[in-house]
């Protein structure tokens, strides 16, 4: 019995490299059961394909795939709706109110004053996430080419069963759960 589990390990996004990296692929065995654990990058470039042969072999031998979030949940409007709900301050809260002046000035220098004012209802973790994703996209990485999307599409085409380790709510809680003093470091 073989499974391929895709999970974000370490950095949530790829960060370009000169040499082709060794895949983050581990094998755990007990008796007849074999589980392959693959660290997944959510954004890649076309040049990152084809996948390493060890990854392709693990996929070919997998009876099922386990993702961070089940593919059906990834397609749900609850993901973006829940994320936006968690990202907004409650009535009366604002980004200006929680950011130290020096941090706000750095953010304005980076984003522009109008963009910061337009983001005033958003919590710091969400601003950080958006800035990070924006820089990764500018570097040429593409979420449609991420390993998770790649294997979700292949599993669907190959009729391989899939499931998730966490729910959308779990992911949103992990992203938004840091205390405010940690969000504004």
Give the role of each language-model region.
Residues 5, 13-18, 22-185:
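Structured, acidic catalytic/metal-binding patches in enzyme active sites
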Residues 1-3:
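Bacterial N-terminal signal peptides that target proteins for export
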